Amino acid sequence: MLQILAESAEGLAQKVMAAAGFKVKASDRAGADKGSLATDYLIFIANNEIDKLADLAIAAFDEGEDVSKMKKEVSAIFHGPQAVDIALFGRMLADAPDLNTDASAQVAHAFSIDQITPEYDYFTAVDDCASEDNAGAAMIDTVGFNSSTLYRYATVNIDALRDQLQDDSATVEGVVAFVEAFVKSMPSGKQNTFANHTLPEDVVVTLRESQPISAADAFEDPVRRKDGISVSRQGVERLGERQNDIRENYGEEPVKAWYVATGGAVSSLNEWCEQVSLPDLEQSLKETLNAAYSA
């Protein structure tokens, strides 16, 4: 029986995809994948969804039923508890829009708060094995780069995340993990060339009941260098001042707020934020969310 099931596995997988509304055809990609079955586009499916879809296909096979007709059962699996990455960043399926998952996280493009001065890394490479009458560089090129101070912003709709994960503990752990990843992660492109392994000068985390609020407009006027005061430090102070303006003029008082600052206390943040280390911030955030769910 297991041998027969193994031989039918690919066909069953194809029928499951058909029940979900996805078209499967022979791949025209070059290499070893050419001719193998593939969907028209990439589909983000969580491991727990794969397991449940496989169980459904096996049960249908054992009962002699056609899993390709089990559209309701397949849809229920896609609408069940989501994996944290899908719950955070969403999933769009053009052929099956009813299976789409709205993202509970939003991540803004980082932008420079100061004036950028492009610089260029000029490099040459010489062929050590070239003949004596073939002098000169084998390669000459430049790589553009800049060293800017960035403002980064992201927000998570915790209620929406809880609805998709359907688990209080997973929601709390997911939010805390997202905060740490957002703070510490850096783009990996060109890291060997520029070693851009930096951590933020300042991190502000707020819990709000009303709406997410970005302070991007604090830097509409670029930060300019001053003697003895770094751009990043000026940016931190301006960020706090803008948040204070929002609190005073819009009445947007956060439920809880923390900040991490490597350059010492920030006067404009001390009025409404608790200064902590990142580990303490994560622990306090975790305790606050757990208390909210247990209330």
Question: Where on the chain are the PLM-derived regions?
Answer:
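Basic polyanion-binding and macromolecular-assembly surfaces
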Residues: 1-295
